[in-house]
Swiss-Prot record:
SUPFAM superfamilies xref list: Glucocorticoid receptor-like (DNA-binding domain), Nuclear receptor ligand-binding domain
One Gene Ontology biological process: cell differentiation
GO MF annotation: an example: RNA polymerase II cis-regulatory region sequence-specific DNA binding
Stated name of the protein: Nuclear hormone receptor family member nhr-47
Species annotation: Caenorhabditis elegans
Keyword Metal-binding on entry: yes
Domain of life according to the entry: Eukaryota
Length: 579
């Protein structure tokens, strides 16, 4: 049985959070299991280096020989292992029915276990080797991570919007070698004014500040700091465009709809019209109402039928009569119009499926919510301190009356076409690139508003997307570390949602948030393509740091010695069709 330790006690082997005193030494579950399995299975390891490899939280599974030697050096006792009790492998256990003890459910215990310690060693521990107490400790260790990322996101907004002396880095190499601004005292306050620029095109100004802080933000993660330089460059350039798009979408306030009320024509006046072509007139007026988006009365269809029948009676064509005498009209039987059964919605905010496309049964006109098909908005929300971007900055090259909330951005033809600028013209706007703008609004900004992202959810999604194990160029050891970090962050996000929502709502919201990742990467890929064209044709002056992070770094002396090239200095390299 492990001995309880004071909160915050670190593992003597890897400096991770210790879960107890195992084999006479305060250690984490990963090192405890590694030590036990290495001795029980009589494992023999070989060091590929000089037998002095670093053993810490980030790279503890890189060299198992040095890790085992450090376990012995810190005092782990071989004699404390009880072979009969410390069984390795599958152990059949009775099913536990008390789900409350799991604090989040059995289904996610494996994800939470892998993420609790940030260990890149995924195969050292199995669900059978974990007990209920270990899972509880792991769950509780996830909460400080969410709090830290939320604080980090708030400080990011503070430095981005209020810090007037924030300077961009000259190169990506300088940015990676400099200390992170988030690990230094912050001189600005929330009471300071928002930083302004005199340029008409404000987005390049904000983007160079975003990229500078983005690199400082990445350096706050210990897993990132432990990576080799080449892998750091690969991770920064892989997520740079996605980071910019997400920040711009999250920090842009929503414009309210303009208060324009159109008065609807009075329906009785339309009915009593005695024009020569009353039926067509009523139909045309009603059609104009529908086309203008007005709120038409529910009985409009019956109104049209009644007007047409009355006009036909006046002309004597319904029953084969040529006379229009009032006496004949009074004696003619008027057929009763069969109305579709009306279903009154139980709640407000419902819409009825259309029935005007052919003679559909009345059952087809069922009531559905107005937001049917859209994800459910969260109830946490974000603070107004993050809303300082001006939404009109995204309207450069668009009509002055554009409203990001009112108009659909699916149709590219809505935007005004921009004239081609000569290579010497440097005043063209990046936001005027129509495909990038529309994709950013449709794929990122609108879903963010529909989901009503909270600061914690946004911060966790940023970190999850940053630690992408599929980043091109990562070596195998770095990829294992990145996988473990991403699994930990995924567990933190799910744990946070479980605390804020009921189980079903938490699962649905977790899926909705994670499913945003492919769309964000799709918009980022389109953004990179546009930047490549602008840079190649010299249509726009791009900040050097933004160019390096989005298009790839320029080869520096250090990179040339390491055999690393770049794609932004000189000619651009486009993939061939065979690739």
């Amino acid at each position: 049985m492990s001995e309880k330790l004071p909160p915050g006690t670190l593992c003597a082997v890897c400096d991770d959070i210790a879960t107890g005193k195992h084999y006479s030494v305060a250690s984490c579950n990963g090192c405890k299991t590694f030590f036990r399995r290495a001795l029980v299975n009589n494992r023999e390891f070989v060091c590929q280096g000089n037998k002095d490899c670093p053993v810490n939280k980030g790279v503890r599974c890189a060299c198992r020989y040095c890790r085992l030697q450090k376990c012995l050096a810190v005092g782990m006792d071989k004699n404390s292992i009880q072979n009969d009790r410390d069984r390795i492998g599958y152990t059949k256990r009775k099913r536990r029915h008390d789900d409350n003890d799991m604090e989040g459910g059995v289904h996610h215990s494996e994800h939470i276990r892998d993420g609790s310690s940030g260990s890149p060693q995924m195969n050292d521990e199995s669900p059978e080797s974990m007990d209920m107490k270990d899972i509880k400790i792991d769950l509780n260790c996830l909460d400080p991570i969410a709090d830290r990322l939320t604080t980090l996101e708030n400080n990011f907004t503070l430095l981005l919007s209020r810090c007037a002396d924030l300077h961009s880095y000259a190169t990506l190499e300088d940015a990676l070698n400099a200390p992170s601004r988030f690990m230094q005292p912050i001189s600005c306050e929330w009471s300071d004014n928002v930083v302004l620029t005199n340029r008409d095109d404000k987005l390049p100004f904000w983007r160079q500040r975003l990229i500078a802080l983005y690199i400082d933000w990445a350096k706050t993660f210990s897993t990132f700091r432990s990576l080799p330089y080449a892998d750091k460059v690969a991770m920064v350039t892989n997520h740079a465009s996605s980071f910019m798009i997400m920040c711009e979408a999250f920090r842009t306030p929503e414009h309210m709809k303009s208060d324009v009320v159109r008065k609807r024509p009075d329906l009785p006046n339309i009915v009593t019209s005695n024009s020569g072509s009353g039926c067509s007139r009523v139909s045309s007026v009603a059609g104009s109402l529908v086309s203008n988006g007005e709120d038409v009365h529910d009985d409009l269809t019956n109104l049209l039928h009644a007007a047409c029948i009355q006009q036909s009676i006046n002309k004597g064509i319904m029953f084969g009569e040529n006379s229009s005498d009032d006496k004949i009209l009074l004696n003619l039987p008027i057929r009763e119009i069969k109305k579709e059964p009306l279903e009154v919605p139980s709640t407000e905010g419902m819409i009825q499926l259309p029935t005007e496309y052919g003679n559909l049964p009345a059952d087809y006109a069922s009531w559905i919510p107005q937001d049917y098909g859209h994800p459910t908005a969260g109830h946490e929300g974000k603070s107004d301190m993050h809303n300082f971007f001006e939404a009109r900055d995204f309207c450069v090259g668009r009509p002055s009356s554009c409203n990001l909330n009112e108009r659909s951005m699916k149709t590219v033809s809505m935007l005004e076409s921009r004239n081609f600028q000569s290579p010497s013209a440097n005043n063209s706007s990046l936001s005027g690139i129509t495909p990038v703008l529309t994709m950013m609004i449709d794929l990122v900004m609108k879903p963010f508003r529909q989901l009503n992202f909270s600061t914690t959810e946004f911060a966790l999604l940023q970190a999850i997307m940053f630690f992408d194990p599929d980043t091109e160029g990562l070596d195998s050891a770095s990829q294992r570390n990145v996988v473990a970090e991403q699994k930990k962050l995924l567990a933190v996000l799910f744990r946070h949602l479980q605390k804020a929502y009921n189980p079903q709502a938490a699962s649905e919201r977790y899926a909705s948030i994670i499913l945003r990742m492919p769309s964000i990467r799709r918009a980022a890929a389109k953004k990179n393509e546009s930047l490549q064209v602008l840079d190649m044709l010299q249509m726009h002056e791009i900040n050097s740091l933004v160019k390096e992070t989005s298009l790839g770094p320029r080869p520096s002396n250090v990179q040339q010695r390491m055999g690393i090239g770049g794609g932004a200095g000189g000619c651009l390299t486009f993939p061939s069709q065979e690739d």
